[in-house]
Amino acid sequence: MTIDTSDLLNSILGSLSRIDYIKPEEVPNIPLYMDQVTTFMDAQLASSKRYPEDKILTKTMINNYAKNDLLPPPLKKKYSKEHLLVLVFIYYFKSILSITDIQALLKPITDTYFSSSENLSLEDIYNEVFRLEKSQVDILKEDITNRYRLSRETFQDAPEKDQEFLKTFSFICLLSFDVYVKKQLIESLIDDLHQDTKEKKKK
């Protein structure tokens, strides 16, 4: 079995260098109807699709988010700029977190900062978080490269015809372990935040 993992790695690292996010100034300042929202999100996040037929967001998804308190309800069937920023958070979170966890994480944010007159706006939070994400790209590239090198050192004594597959399997396991540990940490942090929120409501 032949797998050109070096080309794949270079492709992944190259795509990491091109990672961008939807900047608030790119989000329309006028309220949008559902069809306009799905069209906008699909155009902006198309590069993150695994397969061309994948859907970024559908009407059903958005309705479910509103029903489950992940997204504040639209005003007269229209979605504001803040709605779209929340949808971006949901889009990234939903690949690793349950709907319940996303709700626990975002509800305090939307309750406090959505359409708020606070000094800190939802747009400010969005900008600050994604600014941090951009700063992590080089660190992430180095970490992935190191894991790749480690995986290439495994299964040296395996039959030659199986080595490439087994080394790739090893690389996937190394990456998966990292994801598993971080997911456990994220879930623990969300549980702590949720508990703090419940205790504050009791007071």
Predicted features and spans:
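Basic helix-turn-helix/winged-helix DNA-binding cores
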Residues: 2-112
